């Protein structure tokens, strides 16, 4: 249940903790409680998205989201996800040559299919998202605009990325990525009425019912306490300083990788992540003349991920536009929040780029590079 409406006694302090988490979540994004409500009970992002869908759609309704190969998430309508099985999914993408969102295509698809929900947000997109355009497109076809900001919530809270709230009906975020909180999710919903004719419920009320009792039983109160702490930290001056360094580190890493001959999706980054394009043209011969790998020697995302992990560098394989297999894609995703938390700055990012070059292109000894990484990171202990 929810504060004041639990099914069990002895919840006074849990109620106070949950209300505190809600208050801090709204404060982190400068939201008015008169206009917005927030549910802090979702166990993680995937069930949070499904709760939103079940609250606002019927089975077979049209859901529109970013395709997996363009940088979208499974729960945005991929056929392997229940979101693509319960609902008719329409997938939008990016310009193949630039990797940038194709807002003209999004507008045309919305006009053609009239989706019930249009999702903005991505799992692997290194550029800023124009939430205003998404909001305008959704409004033009009578759709709900759901912004999934799971990967960029910390940047938004710090004012380093445009906010989705002025142009969204619902905003969902996980709390364990750039927010640096526990593994969980929160759903922000407008207090305005549902678009369904004759409905007396607000969007927020419908979503609350979908989370509990629709999707979940008892809340994880220990996690909600951690969410309250995460949002408390997100309102402090040091959090903005940290997020600025996250972006600065990502840009430094991107520029250094390009100097070593790597091609990046979209040519760089505006946020905390970047994606290396590992397709056959990923070496810029004019930059690195010594790199003469043949097509047969090119590595896919899975191979690159495993090689780098063996050397002590954790990355994530990532699909690129046109990829058929999410298991062996053509891209490699890198993020800077964790390293930045340890105190790493631009100088170290240049060294990390060099190690990636030596692992993937020069094929140097992985054990040797691992020793070098360990020596550097001894200067940046986790605790």
List PLM regions with ranges.
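Short, basic, low-complexity termini and linkers enriched in Ser/Thr/Gly/Pro
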Residues: 191-203, 280-295
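Short acidic (Asp/Glu) and glycine-rich catalytic loops that position anionic groups and cofactors
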Residues: 1-4, 115, 204-209, 224-234, ...
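Residues at alpha-helix caps and immediate loop-helix transition turns in enzyme cores, especially N-
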Residues: 130-133, 300, 348
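Conserved PLP-binding catalytic core of the aspartate aminotransferase-like
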Residues: 263-288, 297-343
């Amino acid at each position: 249940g929810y504060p004041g409406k639990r099914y069990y006694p002895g919840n006074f302090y849990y109620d106070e903790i949950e209300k505190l988490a809600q208050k801090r979540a709204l404060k982190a994004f400068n939201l008015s409680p008169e206009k917005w409500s927030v549910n802090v009970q979702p166990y993680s992002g995937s069930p949070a998205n499904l709760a939103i869908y079940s609250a606002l759609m019927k089975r077979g309704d049209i859901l529109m989201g970013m395709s997996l190969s363009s940088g979208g998430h499974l729960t945005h309508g991929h056929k392997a996800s229940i979101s693509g099985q319960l609902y008719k999914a329409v997938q939008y993408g990016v310009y193949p040559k630039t990797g940038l969102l194709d807002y003209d295509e999004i507008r045309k698809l919305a006009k053609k299919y009239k989706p019930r929900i249009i999702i903005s947000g991505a799992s692997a997109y290194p550029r800023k998202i124009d939430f205003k355009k998404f909001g305008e497109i959704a409004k033009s076809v009578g759709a709900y605009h759901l912004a999934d900001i799971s990967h960029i919530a910390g940047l938004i809270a710090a004012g380093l990325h445009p906010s989705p709230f002025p142009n969204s009906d619902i905003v969902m975020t996980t709390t364990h990525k750039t927010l640096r909180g526990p593994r969980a999710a929160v759903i922000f919903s407008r207090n305005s009425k549902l678009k369904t004719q004759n409905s007396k419920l607000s969007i927020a009320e419908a979503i609350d019912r979908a989370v509990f009792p629709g999707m979940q039983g008892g809340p994880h109160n220990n996690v909600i306490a951690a969410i309250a702490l995460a949002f408390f930290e997100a309102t402090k001056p040091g959090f903005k300083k940290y997020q600025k360094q996250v972006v600065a580190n990502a840009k430094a890493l991107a520029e250094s990788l390009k100097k070593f001959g790597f091609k990046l999706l979209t040519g760089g980054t505006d946020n905390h992540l970047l994606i290396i394009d590992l397709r056959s043209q990923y070496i810029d011969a004019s930059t690195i003349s010594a790199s003469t790998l043949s097509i047969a020697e090119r590595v896919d995302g899975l191979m690159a991920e495993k090689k780098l992990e063996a050397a002590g560098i954790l990355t994530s394989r990532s699909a690129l536009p046109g990829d058929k297999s999410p298991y062996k894609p053509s891209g490699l995703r890198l993020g800077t929040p964790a390293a930045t938390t340890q105190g790493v700055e631009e100088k170290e990012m240049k060294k990390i780029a060099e190690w990636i070059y030596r692992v993937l292109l020069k094929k140097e000894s992985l054990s040797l590079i691992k020793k070098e990484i360990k020596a550097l990171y001894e200067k940046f202990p986790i605790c």
